[in-house]
Curated annotation (Swiss-Prot):
Binding site for L-glutamine: 57-59, 88, 134-135
GO biological process terms on file: L-tryptophan biosynthetic process; phenazine biosynthetic process
Species classification: Bacteria, Pseudomonadati, Pseudomonadota, Gammaproteobacteria, Enterobacterales
Source taxon at top rank: Bacteria
Protein name according to UniProt: Anthranilate synthase component 2
Enzyme class: lyase
Amino acid sequence: MADILLLDNIDSFTYNLVDQLRSSGHRVVIYRNHIAADNIIERLQQLEQPVLMLSPGPGTPAQAGCMPELLQRLQGQLPMIGICLGHQAIIEAYGGHVGQAGEILHGKASAIEHDGQGMFAGMPNPLPVARYHSLVGSNLPAELTVNARFGEMVMAVRHDAHRVCGYQFHPESILTTHGARLLEQTLAWALA
C-alpha cells in the first residue's frame, strides 16, 4: 500500500484517479498545484512510503503552478508518476521537449505498443488506452527510457534509477482497458 500525494493540476480526471487508487487500498492526499512547493515537500516527508503523483491538467507544464519546481527539487529523492500533463512535465524536467502533437485527441482510444517491461509486464500488446492531449514529448534525454509509443509519438517513459515514470495517456479512464492493473503495477515498480 502506497502513500500517494496527488498533485491536482485542476483537472476533472484527478478524482477518477483518487477513486481508483483509494479503491485499491492506497492512502491518497490531494494538494492543488497553487500550494507552495515547500508545503508539499514537508507533507511528503511525513509519509511512510511516499509517491508523488502528478495529475493531468490543462495548458503546459510551465503553467502548472508548483509542479515544475517540485520535479526539479525532488528528482531522484522519491518515486514520481506523471499522467498526461504530469508526464509532459517529467519529460521537460529531464531535459526533453514538449510541443504540439500532429493531431489533437480528446477522448479517443488508441492501441499503443509497449516494451512489456516493468509496469507493462504481462499487459496486452498493443494495449488500448484513452488519449486526451494536444501536446507530446520529443527529444528525450538518454536517461529516460521510452517504454510505449503510438506510432512515433511517445506514450510512456521511465527512469529506472529514480523510479520516475510518465504516461501520456489516461490509465484511470474507462477507455484504458487494463488501467487499474497498470496503476497497480506502476506503484509496485515505483516502490520496488
